[in-house]
């Protein structure tokens, strides 16, 4: 049955606006028919919902508009209008078909119909376009390619092109699939709805489009792990089709070789039915859409026959089967009806270089494959010779697809190693036929064919980027050409849609215009010819646009997106071919076949008459009414027959009066059936009547519309004919004008020829006249001759006319040639314009590439800057971490140092105690032995003023019965950084060593600072001392300093290795080099002696000693200048009672400790470098502190001076004449003198204390504590002094000498003031008695600060060359301020304390004169101490220069040092003195005076 042609399409191929479409709900009787319904009837359904439950839905669906378009040329309009009118009739059989397929509910109030059994309305489906963005590849990530896409939402994106940085490039799609979309998600979003439409009967086209290397093949085919669209589609199709309904045969192949086929679907159905060996299919004739009218006639007759039956059950089942064909998705599987048989056919081919090749061709590879040709008719494409294989399982289908993919053309380019070089087309056909109809009754119209076409398009590419040449370049050019043609076709469809919209607007505004759209170039490419069926015919089209997110592909991607934007705006028409159901014949025939034919014959005749009548466009209402009457009669007869066949129950007699309940129930059921049949018949009659009235009104309106359209068309034809007439007239006028011009020219030529002819005739006449005159006139010409001549002239004229015609013809040809050349010129100009556009595009691309290069350079620079900054920040962080780690390590090291220092202090204390015990024992033995030896001597004191006592020599008074005494300094042990001061027991042993010692009962008191105060009372003596001689001696030991670990030199933990001499000194065995004294020249002030001193100290420090020790035990040598036999005997006897084994064990432990500390030394040396920088800062702070302390000391000093002056004033003045200094000096050292050994270590201590960052002003003095030398002053109340003869024996001891003194002597061991550098001033004694008071006053003044000026008795060598160099530099600065200072000789201690007592008979005591020579000193290394010392030196030098005797005294002392070498030397270093360089030794010369009976105070 042919569909009706509706009015939305005008003869000029214009579409009517929506408000002019005819719908049953727009008629005047709408309210009358549908006032009880909830929703109006929609004439055209815009969706796929086919379950509309409205009473007139089935009726509306029968009236269906055809979408066939009119021709594009005006000369086809009339003919097509004629054909449309022929088809504008409604067949009465269609009504009966609809009535036959309608079902009613049992309640009689609700009507339902199945629209699938009827022709479905056409659906205008917009083309779905999906965008899939592939992720960046590894190479793109390594090359740092950026993503040019920005996903705005699920349906729109924006792209940033390399040419333009603007974000205006925004595109919208049906759906946007981001890079993280999986294959199942893509299939569910895109392909699943398409498969559902395919199973319901729609034709579906799916395109995969994009540039090369964008992921098209992966999307379509996928991989083994992630299959693509094709494998998943096959799985879904075979899962959805019931197994019992699937055609199962061996693989059956079809070859399309029918050249005369006009419909692919009909041919396929014929081939299927012909080639099938199953009983389900039968052979049928060829079916074509043009033959549908004939087939519909046959079907209508069958419908009328079936309509007469009363078997409503069969019709209900058929309708239910039809309704079940609608596929419903239940999860992944689509449920379809099992009332049909299904068969699936697959074909796979490719389009390579404008040729089609079958991918399923099994021909040998050696043979060249033959290309296939396309044949098309009525917009249906057929490929001749293409294989189509019947498949019955998923495995078979997959094998076929894999075979085709293996035969596909694949090549490698720069951008893609496996680039597809052809368009692959996979076609899946699904044939559907009803199962309940026997094979003999199957009609081809009952077979439905739906197609699923999946096309994997080859990627568009640029040869400049892919770098293809040769055959690959040709492949790329053919791919680009076919894609360009597809783009033009889609753009043409878009323009047609826009024009149709404009025409609709013009119709609504009642404006008329003629638009001639350009034809769409479908035939320019095989790809577009294949796709034409789906775009322009019946089908749904979808497109998957695959794009690359790389910024380098942004230009090609932008073109693809523009193409997809055009494709999104087009729409396709999709309709489902209805399934015609033929129910089985009725079981109870009510009307004979002849009567049904006679009933049907008027209707068919009416249809034929309407088809032959070209001017009738409306229904024949009378025929419809007749058909209604026929239906009423039929229904009435059926009801009568049904009633007559009802069984009547007469079982009462047979059952003996019992009720036959079964028969009664049957009667009730029959009554209900009759009631329902009446209702049904009434309802059908009403429905038909309403349908007839509806059709009548609809046809009236339709006729009006057709009349209007016909009038409009006639007007247009008139206008067009007028235009054509005008054009013909204009052409004719042009031809006439040309002919007139040509005839005018010819007339001009003829006139000229006639003139020439006349002239010639005149000449001939003249010549004849002359001849007549001369010659007798001949015979005249006859008429025939004249006629002949005229005819000749006419022939010439005709020849000329022919020439003119030929010239005109040539002119026409020339015009045509010129017109053709103009067209060629226009073409060439277009080509040149295109080339110019391409050149401009290339230039813009070059500029964009240059800009990209600059941007890349800038990006690289920025990256380098960022990298540098990050590296700098990392380096800074590493430095900070290293500093933190370093600080942490140093803190740990400091903690270790503190712990080690504590251990060292314990060891030092043990060594100190051992040394003290050794010294006590040794000193007691040596002193006692010396005393016993001195008792033997008979020579005593011999006071002789001109002779001076040399250092460490004994003086013997001339008259003395007591044993002699030698004046030796009291020994002090130095352990580590501490000086061990004598204990009480030691002092008592020293003072009371002799049995006759007068000092046994000495008073010993402890001072506050830790020292001792000893007061010796000299008993009365028969010897009368000179007036002014002191009768008491008082001195004080240095206080014990407090431990300060920062005073250690060399980071506080270094100690020298103990050598053999040190070991002997510790054990008390002495040294082998004790008697080897070095001669020095005191008068030489050059630096050579100092260099010798430094070299000796260096040689000492350069010994192979491991300098990791808690402190070096210094052996202190204070040996008096006594004979060798006495000294050796004393030293040998001192080691007899000492346990050497215990000491050796302790020394072994010390050796092990040294080895452990050696490893730590290197680490601490590194730490020392860092601490040196901090020391410099600490020095500045110490300078300010020292200045403050100096001021305080000066104030304290002034206060003490005032107190001393008061004391001196309170004492009586002593007037004693003394001899001049010249008389005191003698060449032979016969007189006994007292000298003191001063050892100044303040400079070294100050230097090391500054380096150790400690404020060691007080500690320096504590470390430099020494026993103040004994000084003798003359008592003011003593009588006139008498000269004492000096000792003549060199073996007398100073201890015994003091024991022989009768007067009371008080000795104070006092702590020196801090930071005071002692300086010794030379004092001279007066020779006259009148100047005794002045001399004594000067002596007291010079001796006021003697404890501060005298250096420590014990000193050590410098252990470092660096300290010696710093002291030498500092000494050069102080040399300018004092003239008496000079480089120190190579000595460590020098003390000369001699006291000569001249005891006269009858006198108390003889006076003692003290002469102190100037000191020899060095500048200390610390600048602050140097300033202090320089002040003291300058004061001392000024005092020295005041007397003339000081120079003589200095010479005398130097001579004594050179001759006698009476000085003490220590070969070992002291840890305390390591902090400073070796300081000069001070010498003090004492001139004896007559002792007096009164006590003498020494401070």
Swiss-Prot record:
Keyword Coiled coil: yes
InterPro entries: Kinesin-like_fam, Kinesin_motor_CS, Kinesin_motor_dom, Kinesin_motor_dom_sf, P-loop_NTPase
Start-end of Polar residues biased regions: 1029-1038, 1266-1294, 1395-1406
Record GO terms (molecular function): ATP binding; ATP hydrolysis activity; microtubule binding; microtubule motor activity
Family classification: Belongs to the TRAFAC class myosin-kinesin ATPase superfamily. Kinesin family.
A biological-process GO annotation: protein localization to cleavage furrow
Cited function: Microtubule-associated force-producing protein that plays a role in organelle transport. Its motor activity is directed toward the microtubule's plus end. Required for cytokinesis. May be involved in a vesicle-mediated transport of myosin II, the Aurora kinase (aurK) and other proteins along mitotic extracellular microtubules toward the center of the cell and the cleavage furrow in order to ensure cell division coupled to mitosis.
Disordered: annotated span: 1-27, 68-92, 252-273, 497-521, 1021-1049, 1088-1107, 1161-1295, 1318-1383, 1395-1451
Coiled coil: 739-923, 1134-1257
Stated name of the protein: Kinesin-related protein 12
Residue spans of biased composition, Low complexity class: 252-266, 497-506, 1217-1265, 1324-1334, 1365-1383, 1425-1446
Gene3D superfamilies: Kinesin motor domain
Basic and acidic residues bias spans: 1161-1212, 1338-1348
Any one Gene Ontology cellular component term annotated for this protein: microtubule
Keywords: ATP-binding, Cell cycle, Cell division, Coiled coil, Cytoplasm, Cytoskeleton, Microtubule, Mitosis, Motor protein, Nucleotide-binding, Nucleus, Protein transport, Transport
Listed Basic residues bias regions: 72-82
Main location: cytoplasm
